[in-house]
């Protein structure tokens, strides 16, 4: 940023200054949009995957090629569930963070479409309300939640309201559980 009149005269009044300012602006915009020309190199050592950006080993969270990855303190790419502060996220076998509804080890989960945070509790999906337990897994059948009984379809996980045949018995579930 130009903050004083001396910089205005030195930068804006010379061809070299304008060129330098243009490069700085273009670099800032490219970095902001994730379009920078970083040199990215992947290496596998003893079955562990590492990423180097501009010859520096990556640690922590990093967006590479439009996908988010997580590397531990030694730079090892992580997969599976990872606790990141106040949220739990999931990285697939390629190390990429997953979003939205995902089936993992035969269980359904939902991850926030922006942050990737695993969702727990009641959640509205298109056409149905479902419930994800404290472990993030979608619940089915009869469930006691906060001292109230709810029923969730045994196939879709959709919350049931009204009369419902559960194991050969007819039950009524109100809209409040």
Regions found by a protein language model. Name each.
Residues 37-177:
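Extracellular adhesion/carbohydrate-binding repeat motifs centered on closely spaced tryptophans
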């Amino acid at each position: 940023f130009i903050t004083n009149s001396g910089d205005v005269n030195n930068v804006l009044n010379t061809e070299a200054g304008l060129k330098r300012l243009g490069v700085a602006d273009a670099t800032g915009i490219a970095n902001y949009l994730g379009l920078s020309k970083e040199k990215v190199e992947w290496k596998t050592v003893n079955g562990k995957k590492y990423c180097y950006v501009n010859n520096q080993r990556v640690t922590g969270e990093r967006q590479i090629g439009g996908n988010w990855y997580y590397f531990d303190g030694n730079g090892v790419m992580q997969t599976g569930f990872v606790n990141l502060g106040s949220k739990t996220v999931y990285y697939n076998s390629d190390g990429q963070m997953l979003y939205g509804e995902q089936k993992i080890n035969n269980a359904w989960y939902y991850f926030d479409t922006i942050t990737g945070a695993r969702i727990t509790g009641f959640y509205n999906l298109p056409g149905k309300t479902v419930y994800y337990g404290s472990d993030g897994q979608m619940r089915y059948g009869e469930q006691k939640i906060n001292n109230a009984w709810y029923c969730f379809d045994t196939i879709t996980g959709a919350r049931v309201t009204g009369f419902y045949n559960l194991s050969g018995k007819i039950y009524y579930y109100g809209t409040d559980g």
